[in-house]
């Protein structure tokens, strides 16, 4: 009985800690998506002059629907709950079918209106369907997005010229059977024709579709994103970071409680 009570207490404390990090919003932005929001100060706003970056996470198809709890399966909500510190506002919306750049930007405007967002440091990242969404948002709003990271995705918008205006990191596993490697390659080929020097393309040799989701648990992912600002002279891309298949394999080692769950979590990532 004592063990049961202790176990329930641990679960309750974990759930309470997670709730303090993220708050669910449903219907807060008419015409847009429901979303989770993370306030790094937990509503305290200790320094009224402090402004934080805003990070937008776009999930893959497996998390689509009308149940916001599905968005906890992988990505920043899971990463923060398991011990990763991300010092920024985070929005994790949920879509039922694809990502519309205009709707994503409605969420950004809501965050700017309600929180002290550093408007020069707004970032978007995602994988699979979220990778498509990331590229579409970056192509549509390059002047508002400081940097983007798209894993195992592609593009649905026809005009990709905007991608040449901001730092963008595209990653894709060569063994991806869900979204072919060629989907990212087409975007890269189109960007290279513009002569852009703001693109990083990382083919992940032998990596399948689910493994790149470990990017969301790696500190260098956030270090790279947060190193950019729309105020940077020339909007240069930072090339001080890299991602390899080996680094993805070790992504969970520095985070609590992830080792035993790593293979199981990959099953949900698409």
Where are these regions (language model features)?
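A domain-start/cap signature at the N-terminus of enzymes
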Residues: 17-54, 132, 137-140, 187-189, ...
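Gly/Ser-rich "nucleophile elbow"/oxyanion-hole loop immediately N-terminal to the catalytic nucleophile
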Residues: 42-50, 99-128
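Active-site machinery of serine-nucleophile hydrolases
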Residues: 52-54, 58-107
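Acidic beta-to-alpha connecting loop that harbors the catalytic carboxylate
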Residues: 61, 95-96, 174-177, 205-208
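Short alpha-helix in the alpha/beta-hydrolase fold that links the catalytic acid
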Residues: 69-71, 180-190
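Primarily recognizes the serine-hydrolase "nucleophile elbow" in alpha/beta-hydrolase
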Residues: 111-114, 120-164
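Short beta-strand/loop motif that positions the catalytic acidic residue
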Residues: 164, 169-172, 176
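Catalytic histidine neighborhood in serine/cysteine hydrolases
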Residues: 191-210
């Amino acid at each position: 009985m004592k063990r049961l009570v202790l176990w329930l207490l641990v679960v309750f404390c974990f759930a309470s800690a997670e709730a303090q990090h993220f708050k669910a919003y449903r219907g807060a932005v008419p015409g847009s998506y429901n979303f989770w929001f993370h306030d790094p100060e937990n509503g305290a706003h200790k320094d009224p002059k402090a402004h934080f970056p805003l990070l937008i996470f776009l999930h893959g198809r497996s998390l689509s629907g009308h149940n916001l709890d599905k968005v906890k399966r992988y990505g920043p909500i899971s990463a923060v709950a398991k011990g990763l510190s991300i010092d920024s506002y985070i929005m994790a919306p949920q879509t039922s079918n694809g990502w519309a750049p205009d709707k994503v930007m409605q969420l950004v405007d809501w965050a700017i209106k309600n929180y002290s967002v550093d408007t020069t440091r707004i970032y978007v990242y995602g994988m699979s369907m979220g990778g498509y969404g990331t590229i579409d948002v970056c192509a549509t709003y390059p002047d508002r997005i400081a940097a983007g990271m798209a894993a195992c995705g592609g593009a649905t918008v026809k005009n990709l010229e905007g991608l040449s205006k901001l730092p963008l990191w595209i990653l894709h596993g060569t063994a991806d059977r869900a979204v072919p490697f060629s989907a990212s390659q087409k975007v890269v080929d189109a960007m290279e024709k513009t002569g852009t020097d703001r693109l990083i393309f990382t083919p992940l040799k032998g990596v399948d579709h689910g493994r790149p989701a470990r990017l969301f648990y790696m500190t260098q992912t956030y270090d790279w994103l947060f190193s950019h600002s729309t105020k940077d002279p020339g909007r240069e891309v930072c090339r001080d970071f890299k991602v390899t298949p080996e680094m993805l394999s070790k992504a969970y080692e520095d985070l609590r409680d992830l080792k035993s769950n790593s293979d199981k979590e990959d099953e949900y990532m698409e």
